[in-house]
A protein has these predicted regions:
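Positively charged n-region of N-terminal signal peptides that target proteins for export
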Residues: 1-4
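Phosphate-group recognition and catalysis centered on beta-loop-alpha active-site segments
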Residues: 19-311
């Protein structure tokens, strides 16, 4: 009996160490800005096989091998944060109305819908529950949290996931420094509409005064003068994040086009210095990047290269 218990504890310890090792490895690669490894971010998790922004979607995306899941948050009537893209629950649940009109407990009564509209047995997760589901398994990008940085930072700290989270928004350098004071382990990524007036000064303010690990760029067309600025961003020891979710985010080079013409779309995005890609086709993108030799690099937390297969 003692031997069985001991074996159980050893297995638990091994799994814990392995989980911590995966996050450490991902962070090392992220911070190294190594262009030989392109990060794949699953938009709202694996929503093709579980309801978007659900615990199931997070777990399935992590099992698929993505590096990061993107989740959306909304604030409840009682001041908590839950996962939901829309401001109302009509599309994603068997309920109706605005998120802000319900308490957390009231929202928990509703069932989440799958992408085909059918009802699942999953319930709306809180931000805390989602972070705990990510812990040790996958990095997490929190969207729609730019106005709540100071409120969600303590939740991130309490769950022990400060080293898992990438926050983002359109805040100024001064706003970010003020709202995240005391939370230096949390990564913040600015978002810029690269084809808009004022984009370059905004980007430069972060590159010079904040030195982010990554910067998300959005652009509607693939033919405008400022597009070449991605090379300056990448040359500033900062990863370029591009979304291939739909045409208006990536100059027309989106996921569904990549299904038949991957080089003209995902390949084009890679040519724009992207080393983080948020996608609605994570499995296919991972396979494409592997064929291109852009998922082979792995590093330990000490910065030394580790054997292939760590990730």
């Amino acid at each position: 009996m003692k031997r069985i218990v001991l074996c159980g504890w050893c297995l638990l310890l091994a799994l814990t160490v392995r989980a911590a090792g995966r996050i450490d490895t991902l962070l090392s690669i992220l911070k190294s800005n190594d262009p030989g490894y392109v990060f794949v971010v699953a938009h709202r998790g694996d929503w093709r096989h579980a309801p978007e922004n659900s615990i199931g979607a997070i777990e399935k995306a992590a099992a698929m091998g993505v590096d990061m899941v993107e989740i959306d948050i909304q604030k409840t009537k009682d001041g908590n944060f839950i996962l939901m893209h829309d401001g109302n629950i009509d599309r994603m649940t068997d309920g109706t109305g605005s998120v802000g009109d319900y308490t957390t407990n009231e929202l928990k009564k509703f069932r989440l819908r799958c992408h085909d509209g059918s009802l699942s047995e999953e319930r709306i997760p809180t931000l805390k529950e989602a972070l705990l589901a990510c812990k040790g398994k996958v990095l997490v990008n929190i969207d729609k949290g730019g106005d709540y940085l100071a409120e969600i930072a303590p939740i991130i700290k309490d769950t022990g996931t400060e080293d898992h989270v990438v926050l983002k928004g359109r805040n100024s350098v001064e706003q970010v420094k003020k709202q995240l004071a005391g939370y230096s382990s949390i990564i913040y990524m600015p978002v810029a509409d690269l084809d808009s007036e004022g984009a370059v000064p905004y980007i430069d303010s972060f590159l010079s005064d904040f030195r982010p690990l990554a910067l998300e760029v959005i652009f509607r067309t693939d033919n405008f003068p400022q597009l070449s600025y991605v090379h300056h961003i990448a040359g500033s020891n900062c990863r370029v994040w591009i979304n291939t979710l739909w045409e208006s985010l990536c100059g027309g080079h989106e996921d569904e086009k990549a299904m038949n013409h991957p080089d003209e779309n995902w390949g084009w995005v890679l040519e724009q210095c992207a080393t983080i890609i948020q996608t609605d086709r994570p499995a296919e993108l991972i396979a494409y990047l592997k064929r291109k030799g852009l998922r082979k690099t792995a590093m330990t937390s000490t910065g030394k290269h580790a054997p292939k297969g760590v990730l």
